[in-house]
Amino acid sequence: MGDKGTRVFKKASPNGKLTVYLGKRGFVDHIDLVDPVDGVVLVDPEYLKERRVYVTLTCAFRYGREDLDVLGLTFRKDLFVANVQSFPPAPEDKKPLTRLQERLIKKLGEHAYPFTFEIPPKLPCSVTLQPGPEDTGKACGVDYEVKAFCAENLEEKIHKRNSVRLVIRKVQYAPERPGPHPTAETTRLFLMSDKPLHLEASLDKEIYYHGEPIIVNVHVTNNTNKTVKKIKISVRQYADICLFNTAQYKCPVAMEEADDTVAPSSTFCKVYTLTPFLANNREKRGLALDGKLKHEDTNLASSTLMREGANREILGIIVSYKVKVKLVVSRGGDVAVELPFTLMHPKPKEEPPHREVPENETPVDTNLIELDTNDDDIVFEDFARQRLKGMKDDKEEEDDVTGSPRLNDR
């Protein structure tokens, strides 16, 4: 898309009086800072009359099923809420325009007004917990929403006809410099055996991209008089739910149970390959997945990267992965080691420089809503939200009663 112009996502209110424009739907967390959420809102001043236009950014953690919300009590906690008054522009909310905002205001005209939000790095990334087959309503997890609406003040009830809601996501990508190869070893002494059993395991690298096979090297030195009957290899996802207190959930996402045996006074060495796929884990309720946008599929949640000492500050869901290697020993119990690793998407390649479109060339894209091939080549595309099985789409959500965003609701 980069060679056809700058893609800009748009979404209008049901009555068409407010339209929000965003340059992207995923905002990257660089550990120390997060990409700013910058966009513009196009308003109809004649429709607004004496009312104002507000834009709100909310990071929320839904930790219970939506159908269990009763008596005004919801299983949801707002982790972050920020408001700006976009129209008329409030002096305290004025910030320098980004390049995207300058271009959009130039293109859309005098009734386009900017808004910018800074996402604190300590906020969690967008994560969805996979619903069970019988679950209905919005899935549990962490999501981010930009909402624009017109009202006389922030306390006023928000009506769906003159409001716009867009779900965005906060994402992280794999670091460019991987850590050392994960290795682990353990030695176990058994009763009635003078010498020990030694297990050593390692991975071929520390960072794996989604869909890549994980190579596990296993080396066993069995100097005991016992037999290793079986070797079990598993990839486990750990999700730390940090809210009122911290609870950890673990879920195997790939497993291999090999009938390899290691006789007494012998050694064994073998390489195993496992590839964790969401497709093989569709029925596991509570499995952490990457936050979604639009109606495309997602994947297992990426590992969470944090600054040193930041784990005590973060609320939400922290995801990590480990490979577990377990030896089943006859009449002796199990011997096991764990190898932590990172599972993420690679950092996308930088978009190529903007190219002016020749006069005789017209960009063609089936998903385009508007396009302009003149001085500022901006392509407008409908902002469509992704959803998981069991989640309601935008139309159904807009039929819900929408409360007013307040900072003291946190």
Swiss-Prot record:
Residues 45-86 are annotated as: Interaction with CHRM2. This is Beta-arrestin-1. Pfam families: Arrestin_C, Arrestin_N. Residues 1-163 are annotated as: Interaction with SRC. InterPro entries: Arrestin, Arrestin-like_C, Arrestin-like_N, Arrestin_C-like, Arrestin_CS, Arrestin_N, Ig_E-set. Residues 318-410 are annotated as: Interaction with TRAF6. It is found in: Cytoplasm; Nucleus; Cell membrane; Membrane, Clathrin-coated pit. Constitutively phosphorylated at in the cytoplasm. At the plasma membrane, is rapidly dephosphorylated, a process that is required for clathrin binding and ADRB2 endocytosis but not for ADRB2 binding and desensitization. Once internalized, is rephosphorylated. The ubiquitination status appears to regulate the formation and trafficking of beta-arrestin-GPCR complexes and signaling. Ubiquitination appears to occur GPCR-specific. Ubiquitinated by MDM2; the ubiquitination is required for rapid internalization of ADRB2. Deubiquitinated by USP33; the deubiquitination leads to a dissociation of the beta-arrestin-GPCR complex. Stimulation of a class A GPCR, such as ADRB2, induces transient ubiquitination and subsequently promotes association with USP33. The [DE]-X(1,2)-F-X-X-[FL]-X-X-X-R motif mediates interaction the AP-2 complex subunit AP2B1. Binding to phosphorylated GPCRs induces a conformationanl change that exposes the motif to the surface. Its main location: cytoplasm. Functions in regulating agonist-mediated G-protein coupled receptor (GPCR) signaling by mediating both receptor desensitization and resensitization processes. During homologous desensitization, beta-arrestins bind to the GPRK-phosphorylated receptor and sterically preclude its coupling to the cognate G-protein; the binding appears to require additional receptor determinants exposed only in the active receptor conformation. The keyword Transcription applies. The lineage of its organism: Eukaryota, Metazoa, Chordata, Craniata, Vertebrata. One of its GO terms (biological process) is G protein-coupled receptor internalization. Monomer. Homodimer. Homooligomer; the self-association is mediated by InsP6-binding. Heterooligomer with ARRB2; the association is mediated by InsP6-binding. Interacts with ADRB2 (phosphorylated). Interacts with CHRM2 (phosphorylated). Interacts with LHCGR. Interacts with CYTH2 and CASR. Interacts with AP2B1 (dephosphorylated); phosphorylation of AP2B1 disrupts the interaction. Interacts (dephosphorylated at Ser-404) with CLTC. Interacts with CCR2 and GRK2. Interacts with CRR5. Interacts with PTAFR (phosphorylated on serine residues). Interacts with CLTC and MAP2K3. Interacts with CREB1. Belongs to the arrestin family. GO terms for cellular component: clathrin-coated pit; cytoplasmic vesicle; cytosol; nucleus; plasma membrane; pseudopodium. The keyword Phosphoprotein applies. Residues 347-358 have a biased composition (Basic and acidic residues). 1D-myo-inositol hexakisphosphate binds at K250, M255, K324, K326. The modification Phosphoserine is found at S404. Residues 345-367, 389-410 are annotated as: Disordered. Keywords: Cell membrane, Cell projection, Coated pit, Cytoplasm, Cytoplasmic vesicle, Membrane, Nucleus, Phosphoprotein, Protein transport, Signal transduction inhibitor, Transcription, Transcription regulation, Transport, Ubl conjugation. Gene3D superfamilies: 2.60.40.640, 2.60.40.840. The modification Phosphotyrosine is found at Y47. PANTHER family: ARRESTIN, BETA-ARRESTIN-1.
